[in-house]
Regions:
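PRPP-associated nucleotide enzymes
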Residues: 1-176
Length: 176
C-alpha cells in the first residue's frame, strides 16, 4: 500500500452557487475525480485507516457515493454493495425512507447483499444533514451487518450531520 500523498483536496472541489436550486451552494467533486493522482490520493487516504482490519464490504450510496465507494472497495480488495434510489435494484430489497427539505425519498438495498454480522464501511461523497446516511444505516441494520465507519469526501459541519449519526465513527477528508 502506497501512503497517500499530502493533497489540499479543497483545491479540487468547485463551488457552484444556486445549484440545484437558488440559495444552495453545491460542492462539485468532478474536478477531483478528473485529476487521476488527486482522486487516487483521496481514495488512498480513506483506505489507509482500514488496511490493518479490512471491512467485509464497502456500502456505497447513489449516486456520487457509488463512484467513491467502488474505487475504495477496489483499493481495499473487497466487494462493493450499492444502495440505490427506490425502484433501481432488480432483486428483493429492503427499503428506508428519509426526509428532505421538500419531501421524502427512499433508498433500497438487496436483501441478500450482506451476510449477518458482516463488517461494512459506508461511503458517500458528502455529509450534510445525515438524512441519506441515516436511512442507509437503517438498511444495514436490517441486513444484520455491523457498521465500522462512515466515510465521506466532504462534510458540511454547520449542518450537524455527524451528530445525527452518533454513535457511528465518521471520517471526512474536507470540512466546510
Amino acid at each position: 500500500m502506497i501512503r497517500p500523498l499530502e493533497v489540499d483536496f479543497k483545491r479540487y472541489i468547485r463551488d457552484i452557487p444556486d445549484f440545484p436550486t437558488k440559495g444552495i451552494l453545491f460542492r462539485d467533486i468532478t474536478p477531483l475525480l478528473q485529476e487521476g493522482p488527486v482522486f487516487r490520493s483521496a481514495i488512498q487516504a480513506l483506505a489507509h485507516r482500514h488496511h490493518g482490519s479490512l471491512p467485509d464490504a464497502v456500502v456505497a450510496i447513489e449516486s456520487r457515493g457509488l463512484i467513491v465507494g467502488a474505487a475504495l472497495a477496489y483499493e481495499l480488495g473487497v466487494g462493493v454493495v450499492p444502495v440505490r434510489k427506490k425502484g433501481k435494484l432488480p432483486h428483493k430489497t429492503y427499503q428506508a425512507t428519509y426526509t428532505l427539505e421538500y419531501g421524502t425519498d427512499s433508498l433500497e438495498i438487496h436483501q441478500d447483499a450482506l451476510t449477518q454480522g458482516a463488517r461494512v464501511l459506508l461511503v458517500d461523497d458528502l455529509l450534510a444533514t445525515g438524512g441519506t446516511m441515516g436511512a442507509t444505516i437503517q438498511l444495514i441494520e436490517r441486513c444484520g451487518a455491523q457498521i465500522i465507519e462512515l466515510a465521506f469526501l466532504i462534510e458540511l459541519t454547520g449542518l450537524k450531520g455527524r451528530e445525527r449519526l452518533t454513535p457511528h465513527p465518521v471520517i471526512s477528508l474536507v470540512q466546510y
